[in-house]
Amino acid sequence: YDIDSISEKKAKIKYTVNTGTAFFIDSLKTTILSPALDSLYQTRKSNTEIKIGNQYKTENFNSEIGRITSHFRNNGAYLFQQNYISFDIDTINKKNKVGVHMKISDYEYREGDTSKTKPFKLYKISGVNIHTDYTPNQAKQEKKDSLRVTYNNFNLFSQGKLKYKPKAITNAVFITKGGLFSDYKITLTSRYLTNLRVFNYPSIQYDLDPKDSTQNSLIANIYLTQRKKYSLISSLDLTHSNIQDFGILGTSTLSIRNVFNGAETFDIAARGNIGSSKNLANPSDNFFNVLEYGLDLKLHFPRIFMFFSTEKIIPKSMIPSTVLSSGYAKQTNIGLDKENFTTIFSYNWTPKRNTSTRFDLLNIQFIRNLNTRNYFNVYSSSYNALNELANSYPNTNPAYFDGDKNLIIESGTDGFINDVLNPNSSLIVTTEDKKEINNINERKIRLTENNLIFASNFSFSKTTKNDIKDETYYGF
């Protein structure tokens, strides 16, 4: 490297890297001591990241270790870890070529002071216990006074009467009796149970089944800590934007969990904003001339509500949910002022990692304008054009003007428009002016009329972002 002193106590370092001749893989050998793992490896051997003829790259070896570990641990190899995989690289008597020997050793354990090995086993699940009201200071075992409910080969334990419908919880569990141990199923189960929003992040642990003499079986214990049935979150913020110079925003949300004993959640959110904006028409010169408030109701079901089964289209591994929401909002800002009523019935699911899908089966909005008389105060350009046209005709009704010869809002503006568009009126204007006045009127009608909107929407989003530190990603 070169060091360039650019100033006192500062330097620039320039690294020059000269790469050597690349090495290529000319042979590949595998030795797997455990028969169960060897058979498992052969089923996905074609997916290897290390192939004869490819350039030697460390990243490919790291990827292969991850691939094999994931494959084994998702198919019963409960005790397997990455450190059991090693590679011997042979470059003796080879020119720019390497021979690769991958070794997967047996399971190592200690018995007293002696280190021993034995072949890896593939473990099956012999039982699934779900502890529905676990607390951190509680011993992780069923208490003698625990109540147990058995449903579809799941054992649900509770202190007292079970607060949930068994199906609501077991639907979120992908670890099943008779299935192989799988890291993927642990991750999927944790995600689904968290998505229910009635429990904290679950703890999932495995123990050897003492009843199995072959020691090939595991008992899965899922510990669920209930969140409070009622929670209230409030906030108060001071805001500033290009529309609102100063604002005070307050929000408050009440969440009610497990509403119908099926892990449903019901949210009631109220919000209010009072602010000041000098960009709005403000004839009374009030400092606070913006007022908005609203109320939103949202009912969340952790499943798809449909009159037919959707399991084949949207399997539960996609963590589907149904949301019914309704809202009311009112806006008073010395403008037209609006009321907005919304009702949405939507489905949500995640087809793959980092993707999300939403389908609004029904989206209804009713928008009501409350202060249509203020239209020409808000849309001053339309008013100025109309006022200029009215003053250009001497026979315009003088009652339409104030003392400064400006059209009076609203009696003067509407009266002038009606006279121009009325074929029986004595006020005669040019065809071009009549067309312009008609356009102003149509725009006024369009922007002041109430609207009832029915819609269905489908949205899909995807991102490659892995975490908050990932700076090289895309999303759409």
Q: What annotation goes with each model-predicted range?
A:
Residues 97-99, 170, 188, 217-219, ...:
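Transmembrane beta-barrel architecture of outer membranes
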Residues 105, 131, 176, 207-209, ...:
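Outer-membrane beta-barrel pore domains and translocons
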Residues 46-50, 226-234, 276-280, 318-325, ...:
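Flexible, solvent-exposed coil segments and beta strand-coil junctions
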Residues 221-225, 235-253, 429, 455-476:
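Extended beta-strand-rich architecture
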